[in-house]
Amino acid sequence: MVIRSLLQCRTWSKSDWLLASIGIVLIVYSFSLSFNSTSDSIPSVDRSDLVKLKLSSKAKERGAFCLDGSLPGYHFHKGSGSGSNSWLLYLEGGGGCRTIESCSARAMTRLGSSNFFEHEVPFFGVLSSDPSQNPDFFNWNRVMIRYCDGACFSGHPEAEFKNETRLFFRGQLIWEAIMDELLSMGMSHAKRAMLTGCSAGGLSTLIHCDYFRDHLPKDATVKCVSDGGYILNVLDVLGNPTMGSFFHDVVTLQSVDKSLDQNCVAKMEPSKCMFPQESLKNIRTPVFLVNTAYDYWQIQNGLVPDSPDLDERWKICRLNIQECDAAQMKVLHGFRSSLIDAIGEFHVNKEGGMFINSCNSHCQIRESWHSATSTRIENKTIAESVGDWYFNRKPVKLIDCPYPCNASC
């Protein structure tokens, strides 16, 4: 209102100019806050850990595009010394889209278009180059692959014709194009490699784990770490298959079934094969699971999704576990039990590893990887646990006690 009233004046005084300047600064500041909502969760990093964006040079020839048709990209930090022939790929997360409308909206954000990617991103946690923060992988070649397809790097272009849309469903082609590019940059000679990612990136890690293994030297040590990617296929508190319906719609919309294990797809409804409880049965490559048994993303989107039919107590509890009453905590403990039961078969897998804590969090291998304040189980951080498992220093099958027993959360 201040600026509008001033614009209606023919001549401005010094005080008018001052008010206008203040107004413009406030507007710009408010926009910067709205577009930087994750800054509080990012630790301070050295300038050397700010890594520039590179758009894929292989994407166009492969027909690999983000939802809006822009080129996909990644951030690459070259390895050094003993890590020169070791590679760590991190798949960015960010949910997914199940309808033409939601994918169209997503195409106008950084999760659907490289036009909105940051030109530099901080590498911290599992991507850090600081040995005190990342003791086992700090000097590896480290890559963050940006997520812009809305279907876990697994969509196929056939779906575009089926749905008569101008959107590009090319997640699988994005994955293949960037893999080709990294292989040409030296990854084809890797001695050690690890594929990882969080949330949708953690789910993508499981989907593409064997592809990653199969495209690297046979004598290389190749393993996969899924963070926050073990999504449960359970009914919500109202008895609805919320997460199952979501996966079904994503798989159907973007023809994701073509990227899933075909033996599984032949036996059951394809979207069920996207859930880790099924997909893990068919993965040949060693896998490590990092998950919290009280994953707030799964609670808010799968177990207790926002709904007009939800009573007020659940509306409060779903957003803050500390506000949950005894009856609600019983439901959340039941959710934990469902996870423990689901990973029962994987628990006896000799090559597998796990770090299942009881924090009310989601992504952890960047935010809570290895520091004085990091989450621990049996006094081990996630970084120490993954390192012990990857380098075969010791078996790692860590499952936390129920919430709120872990003081390190």
UniProtKB/Swiss-Prot annotation:
UniProt keyword annotations, A-Z: Cell wall, Cell wall biogenesis/degradation, Glycoprotein, Hydrolase, Secreted, Signal
Keyword Signal: yes
Family, similarity comment: Belongs to the pectinacetylesterase family.
InterPro entries: AB_hydrolase_fold, PAE/NOTUM
Membrane spanning residue stretches: none
Pfam families (alphabetical): PAE
GO biological process, one term: cell wall organization
GO cellular component: extracellular region
UniProt subcellular location: Secreted, Cell wall
Classification via SUPFAM superfamilies: alpha/beta-Hydrolases (SSF53474)
GO MF: hydrolase activity
Enzyme class, spelled out: hydrolase
The protein, known as: Pectin acetylesterase 4
Active site: S199 (charge relay system), D295 (charge relay system), H362 (charge relay system)
Stretch forming the signal peptide: 1-32
Entry-listed glycosylation sites: N36, N163, N379, N406
EC number(s) reported in the record: 3.1.1.-
Keyword hit for Secreted: yes
Chain's role: Hydrolyzes acetyl esters in homogalacturonan regions of pectin. In type I primary cell wall, galacturonic acid residues of pectin can be acetylated at the O-2 and O-3 positions. Decreasing the degree of acetylation of pectin gels in vitro alters their physical properties.
